[in-house]
Amino acid sequence: MRQDIFVVDTCALISYFSNIFEANISISQSSIELIDLAFHTNEIKLIFPSAVFIELFIKWFKDEEIGARIKTEIYYRIKNRENMQIRTFDRETLENYMRIQNIEDDKNFDGHDKQIFASAMTMECQLITSDERLIRYNKKQNLIPGILN
């Protein structure tokens, strides 16, 4: 397990940038501080699956102003950091994606959640999320080293 690499999901990114989204913070203060550390040092590396940005634009692109803010204050800021990566959906991630089964009959994962979880599997690192379905799934299946919420 890599102790210095973390995959960040959409709800964690929204929590960190809660002032832009005018949203509640859903992750712990220690997870916020970990993300903040990556924005101010190169001690740790953050991985953002491309699905995070797709989900942001689908759910939060309400007008041109918020779209511009997402691009300039979030996307470019991450893109320009040496210790942050926007990860594409590659073959290994796809293979891990296909290994993920629905956790409960009445609670299916959406494609974004599965891609994000599969990215953490591929990178063999912890996931920063507050998504209870992903947390429960990993408790049952133990496919990634851990989840920080």
Where are these regions (language model features)?
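Short, well-structured N-terminal submotif of metal-dependent ribonuclease cores
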Residues: 1-48, 60-73
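Acidic, PIN/NYN-like endoribonuclease modules and their adjacent C-terminal/linker elements
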Residues: 1-5, 23, 38, 115-149
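Histidine- and aromatic-rich ligand-binding microenvironments
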Residues: 8-9, 48-49, 106-111, 131-132, ...
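A generic structural signal for short hydrophobic patches within well-formed alpha-helices
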Residues: 13, 53, 134-135
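Residue-level signal for well-ordered alpha-helical positions
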Residues: 19-20, 59-60, 100, 140-141
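Conserved beta-strand segments of alpha/beta enzyme cores
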Residues: 45, 83-85, 142-146
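Active-site neighborhoods of divalent-metal-dependent phosphate/nucleic-acid chemistry enzymes
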Residues: 83-133
